């Protein structure tokens, strides 16, 4: 069963659906012969994987005669080679492959790794050409929060379905699958026609950028702002009368302005993200998001800050305040409610912040953090007006507190 929990257009949904389309499961480590026989089925056409980010990797110790190869791309190469031989290189027997691992351009990476195995195992040019011409490996982007097995709800679920299902999976309502593939692939695999949020697109790059910018970007700045205001859960931050407005400003007025996708599409995506942040079933602690905040800001928010400045001729106040909040969080100490502030990051970042805050001078703190090229890959003091803006926010947070500082930019 799949247990979907969350908000859908503002309504609370908690559904249970039986999955009845899986005919069997094979373990290639104990049933390798049956696993390889799959390649002999003429009607076989699609391969879909999610072996995590670490799964698409080349292991040079894998051998063709291993039963099976230890790596996923190794097993897939064995399967493809067996199919190639079974059907004597018939070009109509190629496979369409959709890797779902969260790696940018995962299809390209998987394809490269298969080529490495073809060369390592000397499988020949004929097979290489068949793989190139008869098979398609397509880049995808998946987006859905899947907490997995619902430990705390499983007794109630078993009571409801009246049998022992130990494979229940819990997930949020929102789902998106972007597939970088031509229209003929969409015709063969019309998942978008089944009422699912599946998009076939010429390039997944803008969607990858959209997710990183509009979902991960706001997470990174809202977390320290919320935490230093005494708010611990993402949902509570969204519903807070001041921080909620701050999150909205960062998403809709700042980050959205830096992306090159249709406005309506971005607006819809941002509204979906807010609904996900408001999920009554997921208590997402802001402290878990704040782990490694500096590298996260560098990849998720800094590109938006630069693009906004370039396009608007001024700095985005919300993103600047987010950076000041991160720097303040790394000062440590205690919150107004007495909770101890315990930042967590790479030792060199922790040591730098400790050293800078020990000076007691916000100018030195600002210049020191923005000038740390090992964090940013450049000196951010060179961005016009940034040093002054971050210092002003740091001063305001020290003097008036976080909430009053946030009110000042709304």
Role assignments for model-derived ranges:
Residues 1-410:
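Substrate/ligand-engaging "lid" and interaction regions
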